[in-house]
């Protein structure tokens, strides 16, 4: 039986899934067989109904979740959280450190909000394990692009969570990717499912049908009115009945719940927030930062991420900014750091205000650091030998710096921390023991989630 198409009329939309161009067209929302960015609704419901275990409820959320912020291009560790004021001028640059709310910790002057709530963050200054690869794979899965292709088949954290935990709510996907599409595809990867397959790929709300629901003013009230939708809905119901008779996947008949339940769709609608909350996060634009092929200065993503985890999503990924600063590093970073500073502190502060800081972990990082020496174009080049990471929430021990680099910021000196050590910590805060937990690969063979399976002791 062929899946039907329920078409919802659209209106002009801007800056969501078309790179900022205005357009007006009809979008198709397929019900039943549609893969929401790879995760079919029928599979989502099947996972819930077959008894996917849920995380132990605690705090105000009822499940554990993680928000993963990818900084595409590789942020400059020595211009953000690891300034080297004793180094020569060609190393240290023009930014100056400021004191934070935690005595003894200093960070960049262009991160004043973060400095003011340092007690809610942890900084890793000795991050290593990256390669000279421009891609989000390492930051979303713990694995770089290997000889067998993207992540060597290893699933992202979100995909693994989808497989291990399933959905919290049958109308809410467990894994959502907000990352915008980019010409350089690895920048726009929201987290690949790897050998777990498309059933555990992220739901991407910029898919045309879902974008139409979110941005065209189609609300539950609109659906309740059903004017202009009656024929499509009736067609779906006839297909549902025929499918059941034909022995088609019974779970597809329940997929309509995703449409008629407003919980997920409403979570995507930041306009439901009051103006003060919107201003706290900073709004921003979905257009690529500086017109470059990277992430956006779109602070609304951080607010959407918070709303999604409240709605029942287990993992949300997003990208922010353009950090591949081979030139104009000190001209471009002040504005970008100010926007990032506002968004990340609004998110973490909001989680604390809502009592969700024990349930929701936040990580922000890029694929590598930048060269200690400033180049002739006032930029810094790729430097996989050392990088940095920001962590918050998840009940982690914050208000501390872990590790250090040497005098010039070239390599980890004290307490080297591998990217996968961070993943082991995130899994731990999600209630998953990476030392014993496995997932099946294509051949059904059990595979560990990580090669490095020891959480960072200082954080737990």
What are these regions, as identified by a protein language model?
Residues 1-460:
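Ligand-binding pockets and gating/stacking loops
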